[in-house]
Amino acid sequence: MSFVSSKIFAITGGASGIGAATCRLLAKRGAATLCVGDLCSENMKLLEKDIKKINPDTKVHCTVLDVSSSSNVDEWIQDIITTFGDLHGAANIAGIAQGAGLRQAPTILEDDDQQWKKVFQVNLDGVLYSTRAQVRAMKEFSSTNPGDRSIVNVASIASMSHMPDVFAYGTSKAGCAYFTTFEVTLFALGYFSNIMGMLEGITRTPMLPRFVPSAKTQEEVEETYKKEGFSVIEADDVARTIVWLLSEDSRPVFGANINVGACMP
């Protein structure tokens, strides 16, 4: 995993959960700079302290970022290029949940336009805006500073599971997974970067309780999933695969959407 050392990475949704776990592991593996974009600034100072303890040589650049705004994303990536001079890899992890058990069947009648748009603006539009800006930056530097460059888009096992009660979330994640597979044509045509996807399972993060709003405790949330046959994994479990995909160790893999954690079809 030393192949991530001395490199510059951009991580959306990087201040907590899977994003923060990815940042910590990249720092441990010797990344030069971590550019964290997150809508919530609450955990940024804590992340900076954690990274400093893990690797004092890793720089952390935190930005309040709304991935549903293409101009906001473009400005963020341009600021990374202006400040640090390159971009070697990116992980697009930012996303929002949709609570289950809140709608009566047929649930499509109770999913209003605003809810649908909000989920898609973050979970799908945000991935498009981020990937586009990252590819643009990587293309600019590929001729003068060649080398392996990777983008990892985090979708979800919900993209291939039958969960009609949260179909806006599942459909947005299915779009993210398909977008990632489709965009790999950039790699196949001999361009500068590799784009891969992640389908993470039920992961113990601050966002997990939002999927089960009826649960009063974290234990109730996890018990709900266990009754449905899902195991609960840690954010670090997902981060290890993301960092592997960002490293040169994953060079033979491209266009894949890799499942991490248990999945029910």
UniProtKB/Swiss-Prot annotation:
The keyword Signal applies. It comes from the Eukaryota. GO terms for molecular function: oxidoreductase activity. NADP(+) binds at residues 18, 66, 132, 169, 173, 205. Residues 1-20 form the signal peptide. Its EC number is 1.1.1.332. One of its GO terms (biological process) is indole alkaloid biosynthetic process. InterPro entries: NAD(P)-bd_dom_sf (IPR036291), SDR_fam (IPR002347). It catalyses: chanoclavine-I + NAD(+) = chanoclavine-I aldehyde + NADH + H(+). Homotetramer. Chanoclavine-I dehydrogenase; part of the gene cluster that mediates the biosynthesis of fungal ergot alkaloid. DmaW catalyzes the first step of ergot alkaloid biosynthesis by condensing dimethylallyl diphosphate (DMAP) and tryptophan to form 4-dimethylallyl-L-tryptophan. The second step is catalyzed by the methyltransferase easF that methylates 4-dimethylallyl-L-tryptophan in the presence of S-adenosyl-L-methionine, resulting in the formation of 4-dimethylallyl-L-abrine. This is Chanoclavine-I dehydrogenase easD. It comes from Trichophyton verrucosum (strain HKI 0517).
